Amino acid sequence: MSNFTAEDKAAITSLWAKVNVEDAGGETLGRLLVVYPWTQRFFDSFGSLSSPSAIMGNPKVKAHGAKVLTSLGEAIKNLDDLKGTFGQLSELHCDKLHVDPENFRLLGNVLVTVLAIHHGKEFTPEVQASWQKMVAGVASALGSRYH
Amino acid sequence: MSLTKTERTIIVSMWAKISTQADTIGTETLERLFLSYPQTKTYFPHFDLHPGSAQLRAHGSKVVAAVGDAAKSIDNIGAALSKLSELHAYILRVDPVNFKLLSHCLLVTLAARFPADFTAEAHAAWDKFLSVVSSVLTEKYR
């Protein structure tokens, strides 16, 4: 599905090198929970998610967000085999976590928005297009072993 | 789904800032749309879509002006966009899935240009507002 050109890979890896995975992870997951409140359904054990500030400051949200983005970082090293990289995680998300793959698309777009906030002009339409390919590839890979 | 008072305040106050860059925001949004989602170009076979094209600029302006109209009449978006709603239903017939794509690209453009204003709360308000606009534009489809 997603075939990354040399330009795509360059755009993705060079921007990723500037990302603080912990901060970006917390912000991305936090914004998902704020902008699409129904996604909170997966996080009953996370404590207070009662307001945007509670969510964005919640230490469990930050920690889990960092975990998710760290995993994405691994994917970036393996852009040509996203399905292989995410095989086991796909099974986990289906069999144990029961996450609708639509949530992967939502999270991917929130990440793109967070990158835009932190990189402004550098996040050109061309760079965005490469990243959209990336998050679409990840979403597809994570959904690939659903049954 | 309707906008809370707080959400309306956020949209209206941000719109005041945004409106000064409306034209370039429109152009950038469309550039992002056509690059990230090439299938959306199928609605514009009659356009020159190269970055910087006059048609792209003109159309971008139109799109953002309509968003502005919705913001200015945020208490009655349905009335403000009624003609545009009919246009999309009977003439343009853009598949509803594309409104989400355009909304996302507009959000990304705003996030890149107004990072300090684009808090999580503002992000949520804008996503919801554009969702309401999209609903209005597709409500006469069938």
From Swiss-Prot, chain A:
Keywords: Acetylation, Heme, Iron, Metal-binding, Oxygen transport, Phosphoprotein, S-nitrosylation, Transport. The modification S-nitrosocysteine is found at C94. The modification N6-acetyllysine is found at K60, K83. GO terms for molecular function: haptoglobin binding; heme binding; hemoglobin alpha binding; metal ion binding; organic acid binding; oxygen binding; oxygen carrier activity; peroxidase activity. The modification Phosphothreonine is found at T13. Heme b binds at H64, H93. InterPro entries: Globin, Globin-like_sf, Globin/Proto, Hemoglobin_b, Hemoglobin_oxygen_transport. Residues 3-147 form the Globin domain. Heterotetramer of two alpha chains and two gamma chains in fetal hemoglobin (Hb F). Belongs to the globin family. This is Hemoglobin subunit gamma-2. It comes from Sapajus apella. The lineage of its organism: Eukaryota, Metazoa, Chordata, Craniata, Vertebrata.
